[in-house]
Amino acid sequence: MDRVSERVERGHYIPVENQTESSTSRVTVEGRKLTYRMSVLQQPVRARACGQGAKCKSPSADRRPVDPPPIVELKIFEGEDQENDITFTMHANYFLFATLEQARPIANGRVSNERSTPVLTGTPVAGMVYLDRPTPAGYFIFPDLSVRHEGVYRLSFSLYEDCKSPKDEDKTEEGAKSESDAHVTHRLEVKSEPFNVFSAKKFPGLTESTSLSRMVAEQGCRVRIRRDVRMRKRETKPGGREWDNYEDETAQARA
């Protein structure tokens, strides 16, 4: 596809305001202004549809994970100037929940509200890990996301926070502390760029692992690392899987 055609294709995507980057601010009980910034550092590019049925639901099934694995960065700042990075000092737990949505409108420009499709399988929830590279921040990694049906989609990532310190809870309109104790609060959402899910016949194959995937794997995160490029072949050995050339690299394994 040439650049002109590619721009035409992109014009059919459903527009979203929080693609790739998103931010929000809040005020705590003690009057501190906190700003949350999320960025999709590693975008999903392609996937092979894993189909449906009992075989796809099996934990041991080859679910054809989205490639490369999406990686989302979170940074938290305190103050009006947003220069005081407090990501590593916040006394709270964070997790990110991924959902799948259509990236293109259906007939007549309408957006499908059907809940049965598209279907995202795998592990849609990730806890935050603190890494020093590529920059000191909190990261959410999704190495096990698959899509059952071919099409053009985007991932939506919703951040939830479980504050452990009462002083970090939200300030109410009356300026009083929230009536509830420790609870989980939705903070913000960021969306990925559109990506393609191919049928088995059209799937072009997997690409070499990105430098970012290798970087987080070197820091102990469980990410499949592809040693070399291996495009799809017409025939595979009986029982063979497209993930045979992958290895799970962790800091413990290399120790």
From Swiss-Prot:
Disruption phenotype: Impairs melanin biosynthesis. Abolishes the light-stimulated formation of aerial mycelia. Results in abnormal hyphal swelling, increases sensitivity to shaking force and significantly reduces hydrophobicity. Gene3D superfamilies: Velvet domain (2.60.40.3960). Its main location: nucleus. This is Developmental and secondary metabolism regulator MVE1. It holds the Pfam family Velvet. GO terms for biological process: sporulation resulting in formation of a cellular spore. It comes from the Eukaryota. Component of the velvet transcription factor complex that controls sexual/asexual developmental ratio in response to light, promoting sexual development in the darkness while stimulating asexual sporulation under illumination. The velvet complex hat acts as a global regulator for secondary metabolite gene expression. Controls the expression of the melanin gene cluster. Mediates the light-stimulated formation of aerial mycelia. Belongs to the velvet family. VeA subfamily. Residues 163-184, 229-255 are annotated as: Disordered. Component of the heterotrimeric velvet complex composed of LAE1, MVE1 and VEL2; MVE1 acting as a bridging protein between LAE1 and VEL2. Residues 31-226 form the Velvet domain.
